[in-house]
Swiss-Prot record:
GO cellular component: apical plasma membrane; membrane raft; plasma membrane; voltage-gated potassium channel complex
Compartments, as annotated in UniProt: Cell membrane; Apical cell membrane; Membrane raft
Protein name (record): Potassium voltage-gated channel subfamily E member 1
GO biological process, one term: regulation of heart rate by cardiac conduction
Family: Belongs to the potassium channel KCNE family.
Modified residues (Phosphoserine): S102
Organism of this sequence: Felis catus (Cat)
Residues passing through the membrane, by range: 44-66
Cytoplasmic topological domain: 67-129
Amino acid sequence: MILPNTTATTPFLNALWQGTAHQGGNTSGLARRSPGGDDSQLEALYILMVLGFFGFFTLGIMLSYIRSKKLEHSHDPFNVYIESDTWQEKDKAYLQARVLESYKACYVIENQLAVERPNAHLPEIKPLS
């Protein structure tokens, strides 16, 4: 396992401090230069925070609205009917009744002559061409 080298940053920080201390004798140069690089990071953080709060606020409103609608209409007869399985059973029974009704309404007319003489020649209509 490779351990991280934590002492490598110390010479870099010392050199940076020496360079800024010799420029003006005070640390105001460092204070003037650092905000330029950090502003863009802070701006991105600010935008992410605003979007996060907006998303959290919108999600909260949406969930509370859905919950209130669910509680408001929980005892509505239509919703109770939809949530129950009785409509599926009734629909299935209705479909079976319709199939039986249509089956009973269909009938076949039997041609007695065709049944008595199955090998007899039946006349065909020839198309005009």
